[in-house]
Amino acid sequence: NIAILVRAIFQTREFEERFLKIGMPYRILGGTKFYERAEIKDCIAYLRLIHQDKDDLAFERIVNNPKRAIGESTIKSIHEFSKINNLNLESSSKKMIQENLIKPKAKIGLSSFLNLISKWRNQIKVNKINHVKLLQVVLDESGYSAMLKNKKDLENENRLENLKELLRAMQD
């Protein structure tokens, strides 16, 4: 058995990737595995939804992250509409907005979110931006980075470091 000590939790990513690659079992003590951290899962969900509009799990994870005034009742009504009409959550949201079935405040947030997703999809097609640049744009334009920067505490500083580490990992 061996132990590896790191100063900051984001530094575990390279070890984790190497251990996974060679099939070596490992445990993280005093922290969460890199790809299981909320901010990393959020980034991956953004990228998944941008590339696949039918990804309801990704949609649900990020539709109100950061906060966009989209409450649980709105999410529930989107789910119900989706089941009744046999549509994915993104398509249901668009249709509900068109038919004025969303409360005004939530409608603004949901429309803004859908417009961003559409804009990023278009940037991939038209500008051919790579996945690293895309994630940088998503973090800035979605307000995700600003959300973490505005809450000045150690946990959010670590989350920002984790996002930087994810971008580095994507460049490798």
Where are these regions (language model features)?
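C-terminal helical "lid" of AAA+/P-loop NTPase domains
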Residues: 76-82
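Accessory C-terminal helicase-associated subdomains
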Residues: 24, 66, 96-172
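Conserved motor-region signature of P-loop NTPase helicases/translocases
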Residues: 1-60, 150-158, 167-168
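Phosphate/pyrophosphate-binding and catalytic-coupling "lid/hinge/switch" segments at subdomain interfaces
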Residues: 33, 67-68
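Conserved phosphoryl-transfer catalytic core
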Residues: 92-94
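Surface-exposed charge patches
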Residues: 17, 21, 80, 137
